[in-house]
Amino acid sequence: MKPKIKVENLTKYFGDKKVLDEISFEVYEGEIFGLLGHNGAGKTTTLRILAGIIEEYTGYVEVNGKIGYLPEERGLYRDEKVVDVLKFFGELAGMKKEEIAKSIDYWLNKLKISNYKYSKIKELSKGNQQKVQFIVSVIHNPDIVILDEPFSGLDVVNVRLLRDIIFELKEEGKTIILSTHQLEKIERLCDRVLILKKGKAVHYGKIEDICRKMAYIEYLDNGKLIKKEIPYEEAVLILKEKAEDVIKFEVRYSLEDLFLDE
């Protein structure tokens, strides 16, 4: 299968500072791919290169498909109405008027902000402004959706809403590549990840192949409810010893060990 995104030995300098150091990865159709790392790891620079915003670099970058991009810096026309901003970006993408109108209504309803259609951007909460910015990235029905820190500034309810929408995009065959520095956001979302440290790729592959296997277990111990997350092997022993008293057993994966030296 031909990858939707192919990157080989990507290197980028800002002045004398090397911010990306020969990173390589591939992303396939219908995949949710994550870039994970602390601030300054090189995530945003990588996504800006994929989106065509940064053009000067060394290495090979191939992107096969129409792109939608949610930047880390949320920049919308604050004095404009939501509907006018979305119309502008739809027109910029070459959409017909009927397509734009239909897409606007669909996404405003999907993200539960249809009541703000005629509100000015500056009148919206930061969370709702971010939802509008997300719509900008998908209004033109792109093949590839690039999301830089998509959950930043959202409350728990809206994080879940956006996660569900990302999963739906995947089911439609869209390719999604997103960045985050929050482990819990990526462990249960991405099919594969690239973990960056100071511009270098330190791990690349499926979550279960690069993470420490853990388990969350709830059980009764002499009538007392115990809840804890422990290494998988330890949890299995408890499960065997207290099978009748185990209330919940859930396999999880931890990436924490990868960041201990940061």
UniProtKB/Swiss-Prot annotation:
ATP binds at G37, H38, N39, G40, A41, G42, K43, T44. Coiled coil: none annotated. Keywords: ATP-binding, Nucleotide-binding, Transport. CDD domains: ABC_putative_ATPase. The keyword Phosphoprotein does not apply. Signal peptide: none annotated. PANTHER family: ABC TRANSPORTER ATP-BINDING PROTEIN (PTHR42711), ABC TRANSPORTER ATP-BINDING PROTEIN NATA (PTHR42711:SF5). It comes from Methanocaldococcus jannaschii (strain ATCC 43067 / DSM 2661 / JAL-1 / JCM 10045 / NBRC 100440) (Methanococcus jannaschii). This is Uncharacterized ABC transporter ATP-binding protein MJ1023. GO terms for molecular function: ATP binding; ATP hydrolysis activity. It comes from the Archaea. InterPro entries: AAA+_ATPase (IPR003593), ABC_transporter-like_ATP-bd (IPR003439), ABC_transporter-like_CS (IPR017871), ABC_transporter_ATP-binding (IPR050763), P-loop_NTPase (IPR027417). Residues 5-223 form the ABC transporter domain.
